[in-house]
A protein has these predicted regions:
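Cytochrome P450 catalytic-core helices
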Residues: 102, 106, 223
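Short glycine/Trp-rich loop-beta-loop segment that forms part of the substrate-binding cleft
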Residues: 103, 125, 158-179, 258
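Bacterial N-terminal signal peptides
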Residues: 10-20
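Conserved catalytic-core segment of clan PA serine endopeptidases
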Residues: 98-99, 118-148, 158-161, 174, ...
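C-terminal recognition in membrane/secretory proteostasis and scaffolding
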Residues: 2-7, 23-33, 40-44, 94, ...
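Active-site loop architecture of trypsin-fold serine endopeptidases
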Residues: 29, 35, 42, 63-66, ...
């Protein structure tokens, strides 16, 4: 079971482990040659890095169902809709200061929906924070400490592409809210995609990571941030030696978007669908091992089509960096950055060739024309939009999806009570094909004796009748 690392609590403690380290940055990797080398301490590295790792406290107001819901006595007065209770929910995670002006990087799930965010430094100082940029698809958030101080301790960001399996690492965070804690381990694997994330490409480590470590630092032996601790695989919620970190090179791209003042994190639009290469496909195509991203569909006029990609081909590398799976392709394109031109190595009929692609954000070729549907109809309270590659990308839908999509719903609105959900695609209303938000708005006027609605959800058509 995957566990995102977030926990409530307080306090402070410190841990250290062993391994060789000079006070100077080491440029060469080496294997310990004696037991004496194994008895040296990580303490100099901890002193160098731990000050930039902070605790992140987030508070949010949440709606809880009344404990009297379903009680016949209280339903005499309130009916079936019992009033909800508003409660304050607190959570605790970690973060890393990456700029001296107080810029902090953490996980989106640590601060998502928070009404109030504070950070605490290892020296005990606390500061309020503002959210500069956040994105649930890559699970990253940039915070800015509200302070006149422009000289906060900083953890420099390293090159995660230089990380190798077997490298020594430190994990620094605030597990279970006990206070700043340091653990050590090695890089167990690279390019992991078992974590639910839009850009499925993670560093795996056996350094002990527990709930509360979310947003904490994974550092190399030269004191650089190489990953942001994000998730663990665990049956009981504690560490079992399988932890995952978002690579630092993705953190760099996300920080650059925040520094530019971007309000959203735009990833490159490919205009194609991909699937993993199976052993059967690898054998049929003459691949020496199971790797790459199999092209299954290409959108006419999209970047992939312009680059010459065709269904049935396999992308095996980008800028000569091997592509292990479709998630790795998405990661490499994202870290290359918008505006970059990349070289794709493509396998077609057993032969490899190169194609170039210039990266751009998904276009809004059809104006989204958002509308809040109101009135006496099943969609009352739903905000809908015309689909385009950009809207589809924002909602994690296939790029070639057309029509009208439900973006969000007002709480307790007729649309929500009837079971509609964000990402539902409205296909027809009373036999009228819904091709735009204007058509939908016109279709829900009037007072028919019943409503016949067809939607598409997760690729399945659903037909419903309402009176």
């Amino acid at each position: 079971m995957q566990v995102l690392l977030k926990r409530t609590a307080v306090s402070m403690i410190a841990l250290i482990m062993t391994m060789p380290l000079s006070a100077q940055a080491q440029t060469a990797k080496s294997v310990p040659q004696s037991q004496m080398q194994m008895q040296l301490s990580f303490a100099p590295l901890v002193k160098q890095t731990a000050g930039a790792v902070v605790n992140v406290y987030a508070e949010r107001m949440v709606q809880r169902q009344s404990p009297f819901a379903g009680d016949p006595f209280f339903e005499q007065f309130f009916g079936q809709r019992m009033p909800n209770r508003t409660e304050k929910q607190s959570s605790l995670g970690s973060g890393v200061i990456v700029e001296a002006n107080g810029t902090v990087i953490t996980n989106n799930h640590v601060v998502d929906g928070a009404d109030d965010i504070k950070i605490a430094l290892s020296d005990g100082r606390e500061f309020p924070c503002d959210v500069v940029l956040k994105d649930d698809r890559v699970d990253l958030a940039v915070l800015k400490i509200k302070s006149k101080n422009q000289n906060f301790p900083v953890l420099p960001i390293g090159n995660s592409d230089a990380v190798e399996v077997g490298d020594l690492v430190l994990a620094i965070g605030n597990p279970f809210g006990v206070g700043q804690t340091v653990t050590s381990g090695i890089v167990s694997a690279l390019a992991r995609n078992q974590v639910k994330n839009e850009v499925g490409f993670f560093i795996q480590t056996d350094a002990s990571i527990n709930p509360g470590n979310s947003g904490g630092a994974l550092t190399n032996m030269t004191g650089e941030l190489i990953g942001l601790n994000t998730a663990i695989f665990s049956q009981g919620g504690g560490s079992n030696g399988i932890g995952f970190a978002i690579p630092a090179n993705l953190v760099k791209v996300f920080l650059a978007a925040a520094d530019r003042g971007d309000k959203t994190f735009d990833r490159p639009y490919i205009g194609a669908s991909f699937e993993p290469v199976t052993s059967d496909v690898a054998e049929a195509l003459g691949l020496d091992k199971v790797r790459g991203a199999l092209v299954t569909k290409v959108v006419d006029g999209g970047p992939a089509a312009k680059a010459g990609l065709k269904a049935g081909e396999v992308v095996t590398a980008i800028n000569n960096i091997p592509v292990e799976h479709p998630d790795a392709l998405g990661y490499r394109l994202t870290t290359a950055g918008l505006g970059a031109t990349v070289a794709l190595t493509v396998l077609d009929n057993g032969k490899e060739h190169q194609e170039s692609m210039t990266l751009a954000a998904a276009p809004e070729s059809t104006p989204r024309n958002e509308k809040l549907i109101q009135g006496n109809n099943p969609f009352s309270g739903a905000t809908v939009a015309n689909l385009s590659p950009r809207v589809a990308d924002e909602l994690h839908l296939p790029a070639d999806t057309n029509g009208v999509v439900v973006e969000n719903l007002k709480a307790d609105s007729p649309a929500e009570r009837l079971g509609f959900a964000p990402k539902d695609i409205v296909v027809s209303v009373n036999g009228v094909a819904i091709t735009s938000t204007d058509v939908l708005q016109q279709a829900v006027t009037g007072s028919p004796s019943f409503w016949r609605v067809e939607i598409e959800r997760d690729g399945q058509r659903i037909r419903q009748f309402f009176r």
